[in-house]
Amino acid sequence: MSSKLVLVLNCGSSSLKFAIIDAVNGEEHLSGLAECFHLPEARLKWKMDGAKHEAALGAGAAHSEALNYIVNTILAQKPELSAQLTAIGHRIVHGGEKFTASAVINDEVLQGIKDSVPFAPLHNPAHLIGIAEALKSFPKLADKNVAVFDTAFHQTMPEESYLYALPYSLYRDHSVRRYGAHGTSHFYVTQEAAKALNKPVEEVNLITCHLGNGGSVTAVRNGKCVDTSMGLTPLEGLVMGTRSGDIDPAIIFHLHDSLGMSVDQINKMLTKESGLLGLTEVTSDCRYVEDNYESKADAKRAMDVFCHRLAKYIGAYSALMDGRLDAVIFTGGIGENAGMVRELTLNKLGLLGFEIDHERNMAARFGKSGAITKDGSRLALVIPTNEELVIAQDASRLTA
């Protein structure tokens, strides 16, 4: 077995995704999800050696109990896995302006993650808990913990992309600017697209679409991010599962002044009750929207708004390509599986020369990659993302 095994941790506010990955060949030795933290049904599901398992963590359990279970129960059955761990990689949603690349975790890095809490109030505190618990659970790897920032890939954006047209003092004194998210995914598919196009990565011009429960589009010019749809927080941009994406900011004043909603109520509505859920009034699940597009008005409405917004971003970002767009890339749970989303979106972009191939499009689902456009059309590709592999590779490289 390889000795480049990395434990990858992705701590959310109420969940913890984990995996043990070989940073050299990408092989996954363990993967799982602990979820429903702080609730009676807190549980852990995992897959090891091809077999699936599930266990209750106990009422009210959270990150600490989950990591304890991973170390003392799951890994205790395979001590050779623990023994071969060389590093721990942590996904960090927001690194502010401080981090332009992944970093070995020390006091300064921890402070930087704390400083960015206002921009990711749900995620960054959970990441800090995950780091603290990992240091406790794996004392031998104390200096081998690496933070991989979702914002890092976007730090190459020029000022005209990241500044808002607000008083400049808000940026100068309070760091209010566009940061973006999903950077690790956009980075990964950019590398993979360059291989598929047989070009050096610094020569590719792409528009990458990471579409999942959260979604963002990134303009990649000469291999670097020059603009992205998420903003100061992950609320800006596309229609998402429960997030509104772009709205007229004055809607907030209207909701407050005319409808008597509190700031907390408005925040909750925009982040947890909008997007596909808000438009369907039924669900945030894109599969419902696809399955019922022809038969239900709520599904059609949601799908049409979703694809309209996505097509607008792709069209806008084509203006940043210096006259050469190599491909549009679809990734993420929706981007990889929702053939209808891709077809309806690309059908709006005939001006850019996209012609979808229906058979290819329906074949490129469920983990399969490839071109979904006709020969002679401008290229659109499906590339399944692998953020965990990037995190494992960065952790391995920085601690070697």
Curated annotation (Swiss-Prot):
<comment type="subunit">
    <text>Homodimer.</text>
</comment>
<dbReference type="InterPro" id="IPR004372">
    <property type="entry name" value="Ac/propionate_kinase"/>
</dbReference>
<keyword id="KW-0067">ATP-binding</keyword>
<dbReference type="GO" id="GO:0006083">
    <property type="term" value="P:acetate metabolic process"/>
</dbReference>
<feature type="binding site">
    <location>
        <position position="17"/>
    </location>
    <ligand>
        <name>ATP</name>
    </ligand>
</feature>
<keyword id="KW-0418">Kinase</keyword>
<comment type="similarity">
    <text>Belongs to the acetokinase family.</text>
</comment>
<dbReference type="InterPro" id="IPR000890">
    <property type="entry name" value="Aliphatic_acid_kin_short-chain"/>
</dbReference>
<feature type="binding site">
    <location>
        <position position="10"/>
    </location>
    <ligand>
        <name>Mg(2+)</name>
    </ligand>
</feature>
<comment type="function">
    <text>Catalyzes the formation of acetyl phosphate from acetate and ATP. Can also catalyze the reverse reaction.</text>
</comment>
<dbReference type="InterPro" id="IPR043129">
    <property type="entry name" value="ATPase_NBD"/>
</dbReference>
<dbReference type="GO" id="GO:0008776">
    <property type="term" value="F:acetate kinase activity"/>
</dbReference>
<feature type="site" description="Transition state stabilizer">
    <location>
        <position position="182"/>
    </location>
</feature>
<keyword id="KW-0479">Metal-binding</keyword>
<keyword id="KW-0963">Cytoplasm</keyword>
<dbReference type="GO" id="GO:0005524">
    <property type="term" value="F:ATP binding"/>
</dbReference>
<keyword id="KW-0460">Magnesium</keyword>
<feature type="site" description="Transition state stabilizer">
    <location>
        <position position="243"/>
    </location>
</feature>
<dbReference type="GO" id="GO:0006085">
    <property type="term" value="P:acetyl-CoA biosynthetic process"/>
</dbReference>
<feature type="binding site">
    <location>
        <position position="387"/>
    </location>
    <ligand>
        <name>Mg(2+)</name>
    </ligand>
</feature>
<feature type="binding site">
    <location>
        <begin position="333"/>
        <end position="337"/>
    </location>
    <ligand>
        <name>ATP</name>
    </ligand>
</feature>
<dbReference type="GO" id="GO:0005829">
    <property type="term" value="C:cytosol"/>
</dbReference>
<dbReference type="InterPro" id="IPR023865">
    <property type="entry name" value="Aliphatic_acid_kinase_CS"/>
</dbReference>
<dbReference type="Pfam" id="PF00871">
    <property type="entry name" value="Acetate_kinase"/>
</dbReference>
<comment type="pathway">
    <text>Metabolic intermediate biosynthesis; acetyl-CoA biosynthesis; acetyl-CoA from acetate: step 1/2.</text>
</comment>
<feature type="active site" description="Proton donor/acceptor">
    <location>
        <position position="150"/>
    </location>
</feature>
<protein>
    <recommendedName>
        <fullName>Acetate kinase</fullName>
        <ecNumber>2.7.2.1</ecNumber>
    </recommendedName>
</protein>
<feature type="binding site">
    <location>
        <begin position="285"/>
        <end position="287"/>
    </location>
    <ligand>
        <name>ATP</name>
    </ligand>
</feature>
<feature type="binding site">
    <location>
        <begin position="210"/>
        <end position="214"/>
    </location>
    <ligand>
        <name>ATP</name>
    </ligand>
</feature>
<keyword id="KW-0547">Nucleotide-binding</keyword>
<keyword id="KW-0808">Transferase</keyword>
<dbReference type="GO" id="GO:0000287">
    <property type="term" value="F:magnesium ion binding"/>
</dbReference>
<feature type="binding site">
    <location>
        <position position="91"/>
    </location>
    <ligand>
        <name>substrate</name>
    </ligand>
</feature>
